[in-house]
A protein has these predicted regions:
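Extracellular leucine-rich repeat
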Residues: 2-499
Length: 499
């Protein structure tokens, strides 16, 4: 008769064996090949087998056919990785319609959906990670239907008719990381609207609505938010404290609102902000302390399509990490020689196109020793002297000065010669954008590379000598001229330097 110890050992081994067997059965079930049901059972829906499960599309049908297709899928334990209901007549999502189904990504798009019953999604709480109900007729957040989706990561409510977000509208969505409510009719967001989203929410899109002010109280609890989109609203003013509580914000988009000024310290709490978009407003004034608090991290600043008449240098000077500065499509007519002093040494991209700039001061680019891309096309420049461009030629890779009223001159001879030397390079932009200049005496336009050099008495004069690396390495071009040279087109100038 076996001893007590031997018996216990045998029982433990048996238990271990059963546990291993159970694990094997679970693994086998999860790894078992997924199969679509017969096409006739789910028609007009169609099914495909994908790597992670079934991909089912129900398009241009109605609630009866969708309900029939869902019933055919029940009891077979498939993983439905994508269920896409698009362009259907589905005004109401019935309760328990997805009961006993394992759905990971659910899309109900452009299907006239106006009502989501409380029990319609309740069975999906442990599996659903993405829900897209965009382009429908929802007039409010379907809070009761969402509250059990405890593993949801992404919720898309774009293009509906939601006008208000009530308190605790997203309660239960503890794991939500992305919430997008773009192009609705939002006018009011209650103070506790986002209660419960503070743990995980990283991105919030409230763009394309009718908000007239920043919903500060509702936003202040989202201390883990990384990206906030408020573009295309009717926000007229922003003030200090509007963004308090958003200390981890990396990107803020306020483009295409109705702002007329940027007041002092308005972004003071956003010390980690990397990107700020203010284009498409009517901004004519930026306070000297407007960007206080952003000194250490702001790298991308977009101020295009506003009403600025000067470069706001005083406000920009503290931004010593700024890399990308976009000032296109303003009303800037004069640039001071010290416009970029104090902050220009880190800028790699500068866009000044579509302004009214007539003259570039000799030392205006003196501090831009990291500049790689310069866009000054579509201004009113007649001359761009070599002395202006010389400080940035070591770093410059792209320069675009198309659509300026340049005057044909012997000073431009270096440019067509440079183009010929670069002709073997695959430069699509260079081929599409060929600069032009006007011959004063003839009142005629020429492509710069086709200027009549003999009639201009330019032949025989030394304008440049050059050497180019044969292996496509950065080129070095030396200009030998007593005249000032013009940069007259768009060229990729890999580390080129003009002397």
């Amino acid at each position: 008769m076996p001893s007590r110890n031997a018996l216990w050992t045998w029982i433990k081994l048996l238990g271990l064996a059963l546990a291993v067997l159970d694990l094997a059965l679970v693994t086998a079930q999860s790894n078992s090949p997924q199969t679509c049901p017969p096409a006739s059972d789910i028609s007009p829906c169609v099914c495909q087998v994908k790597k992670n499960g079934l991909d089912i599309l129900c398009e241009a049908t109605d609630v009866q056919h969708i309900t029939k297709a869902m019933s055919a899928l029940k009891g077979k334990s498939p993983i439905i990785f994508y269920l896409k209901l698009r362009h259907n007549n589905l005004p109401k999502l019935q309760g328990f319609v997805f009961l006993a189904l394992d759905i990971r990504h659910l899309t109900i798009h452009n299907s006239s959906l106006a009502t989501i019953e409380e029990t319609s999604l309740s069975s999906l709480g442990r599996g659903l990670t993405q829900l897209d109900v965009s382009q429908n007729q929802l007039s409010s957040v379907p809070s009761s239907a969402l509250k059990n989706l405890h593993y949801l990561l992404i919720l898309n409510l774009n293009h509906n008719r939601i006008s208000q977000i009530h308190n605790r509208a997203f309660e239960g969505l503890d794991t939500l990381e992305i919430l997008t409510i773009y192009e609705n009719k939002l006018t009011l967001i209650e103070p506790d609207a986002f209660r419960g989203l503070d743990k995980k929410l990283k991105r919030l899109n409230l763009g394309g609505n009718d908000l007239t002010a920043v919903p500060q109280k509702a936003l202040s609890m989202l201390d883990n938010l990384r990206k906030l989109e408020l573009q295309e609203n009717r926000i007229k003013t922003i003030k200090e404290g509007d963004f308090e509580g958003l200390e981890n914000l990396d990107s803020l988009i306020l483009a295409h609102n109705q702002l007329t000024e940027v007041p002092a310290r308005v972004f003071f709490h956003l010390t980690l902000l990397n990107s700020l978009e203010l284009e498409g407003n009517s901004i004519s004034y930026i306070a000297k302390e407007a960007f206080e608090g952003l000194e250490e991290n702001l790298q991308y600043l977009r101020l295009g399509d506003n009403n600025l008449h000067i470069i706001p240098s005083d406000a920009l000077r503290p931004l010593h990490r700024l890399r990308h500065l976009d000032l296109r499509s303003n009303n800037i007519s004069v640039i001071s020689e010290d416009a970029f002093v104090g902050f220009g040494d880190s800028i790699t991209f500068l866009n000044l196109q579509k302004n009214d700039i007539k003259v570039l001061p000799a030392l205006v680019f003196e501090n831009l020793n990291s500049l790689e891309t310069l866009s000054i096309q579509n201004n009113k420049l007649t001359r761009i002297p070599e002395e202006v461009m010389e400080p940035i030629m070591d770093s410059l890779r792209v320069v675009d000065i198309m659509d300026n009223p340049l005057v044909c001159s012997c000073e431009l001879v270096w440019f067509p010669n440079l183009l010929r030397e670069l002709k073997n390079r695959d430069d699509e932009m260079l081929q599409k954008k060929r600069p032009m200049c006007t011959m004063p005496n003839e009142h005629r336009e020429y492509y710069v590379q086709n200027m009549p050099l003999e009639r201009m008495n330019c032949v025989g004069k030394k304008y440049h000598t050059s050497s180019l690396s044969g292996n496509g390495a950065p080129c070095k071009v030396t200009l030998m001229t007593s005249l000032l040279s013009f940069v007259t087109g768009t060229a990729l100038i890999g580390h080129g330097r003009f002397r």
